[in-house]
């Protein structure tokens, strides 16, 4: 990711897509050009947003999400670097990506063991770890952070100002 000359593009479907969108937002917030690619629109023209200098991160707990097929084929055809995050070692994503990150299979925390909960928490953790590792490599600092966060409670935390409050 550090050597990416273009953008870091994140994609996924369902809850994995929500995690992908969050990781892309985190990367943007530290000054790394990034966006979320909606896999349902990718094969309807949005693949044109990808460039050979980009790095693509695909999120899919099963690793076999059919909506990601066209993105994988396109990235392989045009030699776009891919990172795949999934939990099945024989899955399409793990087999097809340049850098496969294999997650352990986990039992979901809900009463029926099917609602993405433990798996999404783990996927979010891996995505955030990638972002933190990139920040360390970039020698990311508070001064750099201030550039991208001039407003809100995060800005208040480093400016020592107070947020306006509304009283009733």
Question: Model-predicted segments: where are they?
Answer:
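Glycine-rich phosphate-binding loops that contact phosphosugars or nucleotide phosphates
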Residues: 2, 7-13, 17-138
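Internal, active-site/partner-interface "lid" segment
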Residues: 109, 136-161
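Single conserved hydrophobic/aromatic residue that forms the stacking wall/gate
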Residues: 160-168
């Amino acid at each position: 990711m550090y050597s990416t000359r273009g953008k870091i593009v994140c994609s996924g479907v369902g809850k994995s897509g929500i995690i992908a969108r969050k990781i892309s937002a985190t990367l943007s917030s530290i000054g790394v050009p990034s966006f979320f690619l909606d896999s349902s629109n990718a094969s309807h023209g949005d693949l044109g947003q990808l460039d050979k200098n980009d790095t693509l991160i695909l999120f899919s707990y099963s690793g076999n999400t059919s909506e990601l097929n066209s993105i994988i084929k396109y990235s392989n055809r045009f030699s776009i670097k891919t990172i795949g995050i999934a939990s099945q070692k024989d899955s399409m994503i793990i087999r097809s990506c340049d850098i496969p990150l294999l997650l352990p299979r986990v039992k979901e925390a809900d009463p029926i063991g099917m609602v993405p909960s433990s798996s999404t928490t783990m996927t979010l953790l891996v995505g955030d770890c990638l972002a933190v590792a990139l920040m360390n490599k970039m020698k990311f600092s508070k001064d750099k952070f201030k550039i991208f966060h001039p407003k809100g409670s995060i800005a208040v935390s480093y400016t020592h100002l107070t947020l306006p409050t509304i009283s009733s």
